[in-house]
Amino acid sequence: MSMQIKRYPTLDLADNPIKLRLLPKESLLTLCDELRQFLLTSVSGSSGHFASGLGTVELTVALHYVYNTPFDNVIWDVGHQAYPHKILTGRRECIATIRQRNGLHPFPWREESEYDILSVGHSSTSISAGLGMAVAATYEGIGRKTVCVIGDGAMTAGMAFEALNHAGDIKSDLLVILNDNKMSISRNVGALNNHLAQILSGKLYLRINESSKKALHGMPYLKELAKRTKEQIKNIIVPNCTLFEELGFNYIGPVDGHDVQGMVHILKNMRCMKGPQLLHIITQKGRGYAPAEKDPTTWHAVPKFDPAIGQLPYQNISNYPTYSDVFGDWLCNAATSNKKLIAITPAMREGSGMAKFANQFPQQYFDVAIAEQHAVTFAAGLAISGYKPVVAIYSTFLQRAYDQVIHDVAIQKLPVLFAIDRGGVVGADGQTHQGAFDLSYLRCVPNMVIMTPSDENECRLMLHTGYHYNNGPSAVRYPRGNGIGVEYSLLRILPLGKAIVCRQGTKIAILNFGTLLTQAKKVAKTFDATLVDMRFVKPLDIELINQLAISHQALVTLEENAVIGGAGSGVNEYLMRQRLLVPVLNIGLPDYFIPQGSQEEIRAELKLDSDGIMEQIKQWLAR
């Protein structure tokens, strides 16, 4: 990439924000054009999040031009839109390594750069963290400013409004920039709104506003009348401000987020303003690349592609369906015979394989937005009313609704089926997205049934079993990736807590939970070991475990979940309760957060491929 930078002469001068701030304001438009083209060239050659970054080029340039980063705090919610930020903060030469093993982190990451003040990956955390930093800045008294950039999608989460409510109450100096890239909040964009924003953020308006407050001090009736008059006039011109004003924020906008010089002008004014401020900008996701502008969802995260062609290559190199597709097909088939099936997702329709269901059964489908807590309790209400809710959710996002799983579903023994996608090693999105903990945090919940399919057919059978289980909640946990090509059998309800012996061996028994069964078969053959597809993490097949402990010299548990508290821990606990003294090796994910890389790279490094599993067992037996 260093050889190519000469094609971008203005960007070449802005390797970091200090150099960026030396550029004349007139050159910022050229800088934005070059930055957008550089981003297109880079991501198309390496893969990564794409459309969001194209939409925040002007905002990123304006923020680093106006604010004294890294002294001032700029926080990016989620982080999909932060590639331009990384490029402008000294990481331009490494941007092609993003999301790769030992490369740049896919999201802003504190360990990577002093400009990344908050590590992110999950949605809607920016305002809470930003408010904490703003309060700390008040204590410091050194003039540090804090800015939070949050998208209109992330603003749908309850946590964002909790933070807005608190910020409006305590009145700390905080700027929240609402990056509205769906036109979902307002279409009032244009010269009038941009001009109004400049007036409302200008020093003259602020002086008049403050002077009027002082003049009316001690005259509460006139003060309240003036306040209402100002709000009514403002709401006529800017109809969206009411909600944020009621929360205690001074609302400005909406303004054109692609007018970099206008943004610089407004941000310079707002940097001097006191109290909580909300700037509403309108941007276009995928800006500057026509295919991404037309279909920003498809171009949200992309593999390598040829920009000249304008089409993404077909990614599924396997002939077998993904587990998400297996779930989606099962869901559609189940809904044809049951009108009380209700499918729920927290803003992951495509990722969870639900697009076809949403189109075929719109009355039985609910996308509740980025609101995992609400999704689970919404499902509880449906279950109480006699419906059969299925919550499709990524493992890493179910963490956000843990109290609701316990308090609103499990305690009441409600028949909610959790279809947990992306269990285990997920890959390129790194620490925040690995599905490492679900078996551990669900296994301790009373009344919960937990199933781990070893292949796509077993996934279907377990979804069918969970759907027809009426004595409490159930969970089917499956990985990101493709099946292995097994034939489908007729759907049937599996006996609860019963495993299958896949291979009878001697001395060692391998108890496998999930899709590592393919690797385990090779290992079992090498050691002449008994191999068991455990199927159920809860309830365990304790009768079979009893037999294996008595008839074998050692047991090995295998899972793609944290070893601490996982399925293997459940086996250990049972053996100890029964005072069955047999050596057990628990193989799974280690006690640290797993960084980004391909699934194959990570499994090899963690010794969860067949060679690595054999090595772990050999070393253990040799002790």
Swiss-Prot record:
Family matches, as SMART domains: Transket_pyr (SM00861)
Entry EC number(s): 2.2.1.7
GO CC entries: cytosol
Keyword Thylakoid among record annotations: no
Co-factor(s): Mg(2+); thiamine diphosphate
Highest taxon of source: Bacteria
Pathway: Metabolic intermediate biosynthesis; 1-deoxy-D-xylulose 5-phosphate biosynthesis; 1-deoxy-D-xylulose 5-phosphate from D-glyceraldehyde 3-phosphate and pyruvate: step 1/1
GO MF annotations in UniProt: 1-deoxy-D-xylulose-5-phosphate synthase activity; magnesium ion binding; thiamine pyrophosphate binding
Keyword match Repeat: no
Annotated residues for binding of thiamine diphosphate: 80, 121-123, 153-154, 181, 289, 372
PROSITE patterns referenced in this protein's UniProt entry, alphabetically: TRANSKETOLASE_1 (PS00801), TRANSKETOLASE_2 (PS00802)
EC supergroup of this enzyme: transferase
Keywords for the protein's UniProt record, in alphabetical order: Isoprene biosynthesis, Magnesium, Metal-binding, Thiamine biosynthesis, Thiamine pyrophosphate, Transferase
Cofactor mode of binding and number, as noted: Binds 1 Mg(2+) ion per subunit.
GO BP field: 1-deoxy-D-xylulose 5-phosphate biosynthetic process; isopentenyl diphosphate biosynthetic process, methylerythritol 4-phosphate pathway; terpenoid biosynthetic process; thiamine biosynthetic process
Reactions listed under catalytic activity: D-glyceraldehyde 3-phosphate + pyruvate + H(+) = 1-deoxy-D-xylulose 5-phosphate + CO2
Residues at which Mg(2+) binds: 152, 181
Disulfide bonds: none
Subunit structure: Homodimer.
Assigned protein family: Belongs to the transketolase family. DXPS subfamily.
The protein's role, per its UniProt record: Catalyzes the acyloin condensation reaction between C atoms 2 and 3 of pyruvate and glyceraldehyde 3-phosphate to yield 1-deoxy-D-xylulose-5-phosphate (DXP).
Name listed for the protein in its UniProt record: 1-deoxy-D-xylulose-5-phosphate synthase
Species assigned in the record: Baumannia cicadellinicola subsp. Homalodisca coagulata
Phylogenetic lineage: Bacteria, Pseudomonadati, Pseudomonadota, Gammaproteobacteria, Candidatus Palibaumannia
Annotated gene: dxs
